[in-house]
């Protein structure tokens, strides 16, 4: 790196300047207030942890996204967090160790080795909420509602909500007797909706024809909520786990349609995001014109097992930077203020303190500084009036 480009940041790493930084902070405060009103307690996990704790129960994807380094104190491998969800699960299972439903929220920068998608960020500001200790539709619906309220607070509309359920695939794969390698291959094909490949793969399995047909049907079971009725027909005879999963999706979809009729629902039974750690309903939110998911979430009941407690859990996460960018709200103009001259008069200092206590933005001049009040971003000044009192006047 030469002297002329020392200012360059690594690809995918951003800094927030005025007024964007102000908008991000405003949105952050609004979201934390929202979560507080819903009963979610704020936690602040560390930026770095030992790798075995940081990657617990998350699969290989998060491992690849995690920057790793060696602890100079003991030689153990550490990771810079790429996702705060496992950290919050550790806090619930080990640090808090409560027996009642626990609602936690979090917000902070995470770091990725590679961006998600073209020109994506490697340093998102992750925002999320998790509900531990309840296994049922009420907590699933609450999580989705809070995610949708998050969008509302940040001014993001025109939401598409995609619903799925990993237990349907797990049950059908178990019926077919798939090995771990077979399951991984089929999983990849389903994500690509590669129906000819799926059919050829299934035809090579030593499984009953009706079992293979049900797995093949997964690749086509996507669309509006009518897909759930079609799934009941095509997956008939698949077993109680599949029926229960379809019932759960129907109940969740009904609740969302009733409470948020403006949200457009899409059901995709082959969408298996987070398959390696999710255990039930999964969901993602999209907006037109944005190729990546805006938020994701779902049920993951086993993630706390290695920390000593496998509590039921569901939650969601999103990126604050993306929310602000998609909000459609113009960035506020630079805040204006009151300029106070560089004068040691105690009465001036008292006037400045009084104005600041009322929430005014007051910039105190510095002896010998260049630039006038307007150059300092001020539209008013503190000046002596005819009675030698310090008063605020417009420029």
Curated annotation (Swiss-Prot):
Other observations noted: This function is generally fulfilled by the C-terminal part of HisG, which is missing in some bacteria such as this one.
GO BP terms in the entry: L-histidine biosynthetic process
Function, as annotated: Required for the first step of histidine biosynthesis. May allow the feedback regulation of ATP phosphoribosyltransferase activity by histidine.
Localization: Cytoplasm
Similarity comment: Belongs to the class-II aminoacyl-tRNA synthetase family. HisZ subfamily.
First-listed, main subcellular location of the protein, grouped into a coarse class: cytoplasm
Leader sequence segment: none
Protein name: ATP phosphoribosyltransferase regulatory subunit
Biological pathway: Amino-acid biosynthesis; L-histidine biosynthesis; L-histidine from 5-phospho-alpha-D-ribose 1-diphosphate: step 1/9
Keywords: Amino-acid biosynthesis, Cytoplasm, Histidine biosynthesis
Organismal lineage: Bacteria, Pseudomonadati, Pseudomonadota, Gammaproteobacteria, Chromatiales
UniProt subunit comment: Heteromultimer composed of HisG and HisZ subunits.
SUPFAM superfamilies, per the entry: Class II aaRS and biotin synthetases
A cellular-component GO term for this protein: cytoplasm
């Amino acid at each position: 790196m030469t002297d002329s480009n020392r200012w360059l940041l690594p690809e995918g790493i951003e800094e927030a300047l005025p007024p964007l930084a102000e908008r991000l902070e405003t949105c952050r405060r609004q979201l934390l207030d929202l979560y507080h009103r819903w009963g979610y307690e704020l936690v602040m996990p560390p930026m770095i942890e030992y790798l075995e704790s940081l990657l617990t129960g998350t699969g290989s994807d998060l491992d690849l996204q995690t920057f790793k380094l060696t602890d100079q104190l003991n030689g153990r491998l550490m990771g810079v967090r790429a996702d705060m969800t496992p950290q919050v699960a550790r806090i619930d299972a080990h640090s808090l160790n409560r027996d009642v439903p626990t609602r936690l929220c979090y917000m902070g920068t995470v770091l990725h080795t590679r961006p998600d998608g073209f020109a994506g960020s490697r340093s998102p500001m992750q925002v999320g909420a998790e509900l531990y200790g309840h296994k049922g539709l009420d907590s699933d619906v609450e999580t989705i509602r809070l995610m949708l309220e998050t969008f509302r607070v940040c001014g993001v509309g025109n939401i598409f909500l995609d619903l799925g359920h990993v237990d349907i695939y797990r049950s059908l794969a178990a019926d077919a007797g798939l090995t771990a390698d077979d399951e991984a291959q089929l999983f990849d094909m389903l994500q690509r909706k590669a129906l000819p490949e799926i059919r050829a793969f299934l035809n090579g399995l030593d499984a009953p024809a009706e079992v293979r047909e049900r797995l093949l049907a997964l690749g086509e079971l996507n669309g509006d909520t009518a897909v759930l009725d079609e799934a009941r027909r095509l997956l008939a005879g698949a077993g109680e786990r599949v029926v229960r999963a379809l019932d759960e999706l129907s109940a969740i979809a009904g609740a969302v349609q009733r409470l948020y009729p403006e949200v457009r629902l899409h059901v995709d039974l082959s969408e298996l995001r987070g398959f390696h750690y999710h255990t039930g309903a999964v969901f993602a939110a999209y907006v037109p014109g944005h190729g990546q998911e805006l938020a994701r979430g779902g049920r993951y009941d086993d993630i706390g097992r290695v920390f000593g407690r496998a509590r039921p859990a569901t939650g969601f996460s999103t990126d604050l930077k993306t929310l602000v960018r998609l909000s459609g709200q113009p960035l506020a103009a630079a805040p204006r203020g009151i300029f106070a001259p560089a004068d040691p008069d105690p009465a001036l200092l008292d006037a400045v303190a009084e104005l600041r206590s009322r929430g005014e933005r007051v910039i105190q001049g510095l002896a010998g500084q260049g630039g006038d009040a307007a150059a300092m971003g001020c539209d008013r000044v503190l000046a002596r009036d005819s009675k030698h009192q310090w008063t605020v006047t417009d420029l």
